[in-house]
Design a protein with these regions (language model features):
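Catalytic alpha/large subunits of respiratory electron-transfer oxidoreductases
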Residues: 1-304
Length: 304
């Protein structure tokens, strides 16, 4: 960072979007002499607000690394012009026996255009099949409209949160901050009942103490959200799926077998009883498409 020090009036700025996770925080990129020198937050009320994570702010050096860029077009080991490359590609594609391998670090648009060139049946997305199934399931959830997808702002305003099988600090740090803020909302409501204004941080902190809102985390390994949670469950992927199935059954008014899982599910729902809104968080980390479907089902039932 010391070698990148530049006075702000010497920088050329442009709006951008962070590509390190799926949240897509809004950024302002500062450039000088053809190199990125500074990344700042760009306010967007519905996405990242006033904050970005350290990864988004400081992890930009790869952009300046010329060793990993394609500086010259090549055909084999021979440098070629753009026209020669296009002509060679045209000949390859005309034979109808060409496959294409996409990249999970390339843009959606680049992968789409590559797939259009070779056709759906000749395109490989460069992700494991289980992950592909999970992503396809998430797409179906979006398209169905049965469960409303919350913005970060809405997650921050939720009073109850359930994280199923996702280490949010690793996969989406800005979402993790929103969940931590959500965990304070229910205790904050208690402080407002005795007329402590929300802006009076010290008084609110003294009143709340270690009181935590109904944030529940179910994950095979410890996560950094555990310290803020009302209860953290150490469970395998199959056990988390069983917990989600039990929650769905209880929300549908069905009878469930007595036992530890039923008690945990009932405890979660009891804590959510007076919550104004609840957020369900799930992802592709465990590569369990059934868990994603159950998470969407829970969210849909809670909205009814």
């Amino acid at each position: 960072l010391r070698s990148h020090y530049t006075r702000k009036w010497d920088l050329t700025h442009a709006p951008s979007i962070c590509n390190h996770c799926a949240v897509g925080c809004n950024l302002i990129m500062g450039e000088r002499y053809g190199q990125v020198r500074r990344v700042l937050n760009r306010y967007n009320e519905q996405v990242n607000g006033y904050f970005i994570c350290d990864k988004g702010r400081f992890n930009y050096e790869y952009i300046n690394n010329t060793d990993t860029r394609i500086l010259k077009s090549r055909i084999g080991a021979t440098t070629a012009s753009e026209a020669e490359v296009i002509a060679t590609l045209r000949n390859l594609l005309s034979g109808g026996r060409t496959i294409a391998i996409g990249s999970s670090v390339a843009s959606v648009e680049a992968n789409y255009l590559l797939r259009q060139l070779v056709g759906m049946e000749n395109f490989y997305a460069d992700i494991p099949f289980d992950t592909w199934e999970s992503v396809a399931t998430i797409r179906k959830v979006y398209e169905s409209g049965n469960a409303r997808i919350l913005t970060l702002k809405e997650v921050e305003q939720a009073e109850g949160v359930l994280v199923l099988g996702e280490d949010v600090y690793q996969s989406a740090p800005r979402l993790a901050l929103a969940i931590r803020q959500a965990a304070r909302n229910k205790p904050l409501r208690k402080s407002q009942k005795i007329n402590i204004p929300a802006w009076h941080a010290n008084a609110v902190k003294t009143f709340i103490g270690m009181d935590r809102g109904p944030l529940f985390v179910a994950h095979p390994q410890p996560t950094w959200l555990d310290e803020m949670s009302l209860q953290a469950f150490r469970k395998t992927s199959a056990e988390i799926e069983q917990l989600a199935e039990t929650l769905v059954a209880l929300l549908e008014g069905k009878d469930v077998p007595t036992g530890k899982v039923a008690d945990e599910a009932k405890h979660i729902l009891n804590e959510w009883a007076d919550c104004k809104s609840v957020a369900i968080v799930c992802g592709t980390s465990l590569q369990n498409k059934k868990l994603i479907e159950l998470s969407a089902k829970i969210a849909s039932l809670l909205q009814q």
